[in-house]
Amino acid sequence: AAGLGWRAYPLHGCGFQTLMKQILKKVRTFAQENELFDPGQKLCAAVSGGADSMALLRILLELQPEFGYQLTACHVNHGLRGASADRDEAFVRGECGRLGVPLRVFHPADVGFAVPPRAGENWARKLRCACFDVLHAEGITTVAAAHTATDQAETLLFRLARGTGLHGAAGIRPKREGFCHPLLCLTRGETERFCTGCGQRWVEDETNDSDAYARNRLRHGALPALRSANAAAEENLARFCEKAARADAYFAQKAEVLLEDAEVLLPQRLPAGAVYAMQKEEPVWALGPLQEADPLLLEAALHRLVSPVRDAEEKYVRLLCTLVEQGSGAVQLTEAVRFWAGGGVLWVEEAVE
């Protein structure tokens, strides 16, 4: 039951050996295809104590000899769940000690955070990012997170419901600078079966049972409904994300060329705001090439402009698309950043601090 702490150790058997080989083969192939690991790489597994992260730790231990990375682990105690959080920390400390994996534990105060009265998911995410920044600064090459194909499916459904474009539909990427996700090829059911088969305990986070969070409502409602229609629904959704990622990469390359061309083909007379932007060495883009581009390519180009400023949700990209089509006006993206169009060009105005 949720919150009780862990599952009992099961017996080993021939079925486990087959299961372990199958899962290790899937992760090995996925890691090779996406070039996740390198010899000598300093790899740190982010371990919460749940089934996914404990499966990640055990799988990385098994694959360590053939890939040659240096494996450590980290655990972030957010301080939000009282005794349950302390129980999870103690559990992870014990398991890493038993497995011989060096562990780094973080508390909010370690990275200058204080727990606010109503700390939510965004605060917890920022805390983890701050902890990972410390690891990277101390020499960790890559943090390995335990996101699975089930997480990928949930992410896709959540983004589609909120409104997303091709970039968002690509979901969680197998790797990005400083991070990798080796278990995107496995479902949550597979990580639990792997742990059960190899006798690996895990802790249960009781907040996963609460429907107070939108992602949990998807997990408890939408995904079971999709599985009833097709048992492979999670894998199929994750596979769609892979295709979306490839398409997004293709359009991103084309979008970069489009923006480069638009920076060159500027009219001779520019609005005062665009002149000022250029004096500050900020880019200015000709509207003509943008207006003539395929709508999908335009969206990809504008996504590249939005993403450094704020989360590139579909609504902000659509606002910029409308601005480009109209050829005049302004879109306020944040308190400090505004996009302007006029005089045949598009430019960015940033507030002076």
Question: What does each of the following model-derived ranges do?
Answer:
Residues 19-224:
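Core alpha/beta nucleotide-donor-binding catalytic domains of modification enzymes
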Residues 198-235, 239-242, 246, 341, ...:
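Mid-to-C-terminal catalytic subdomains of enzymes
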Residues 162, 166, 188, 227-231, ...:
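Alpha-helix boundary/capping and short turn/kink residues
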Residues 16-52, 72-76, 108, 127, ...:
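AMP-forming adenylation/ATP pyrophosphatase catalytic core
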